[in-house]
Design a protein with these regions (language model features):
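Short, charge/polar-rich alpha-helical segments
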Residues: 1-13
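Non-transmembrane amphipathic alpha-helical segments
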Residues: 11, 15-26, 49, 53-56
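Short, charge-rich amphipathic interface segments used for partner binding and complex assembly
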Residues: 33-65
Length: 68
């Protein structure tokens, strides 16, 4: 789970990089099956990271300090 704003920013940057990779695959992979196989891992990781971001943003900063 994301613990602070620095980790949040890092995760958001990582999501953007993974999205760019999927966009690149869409352009270069001509076989739809190969595209889906190649992109699925990136998309699953994007989903996981977005869930982490959502969980972090749901919490108020004081909630995070209680867990320390």
């Amino acid at each position: 789970m994301i613990q602070n704003d620095i980790e949040l920013q890092t995760t958001l940057e990582r999501i953007a990089k993974f999205q760019q990779q999927v966009l690149h695959l869409r352009k270069v992979e001509v076989n739809p099956t190969n595209y889906r196989l190649s992109a699925s891992g990136f998309l699953a990781e994007i989903d996981r990271m977005q869930l982490d971001v959502r969980e972090y943003l749901t919490l108020h900063p004081s909630d995070l300090k209680k867990g320390e």
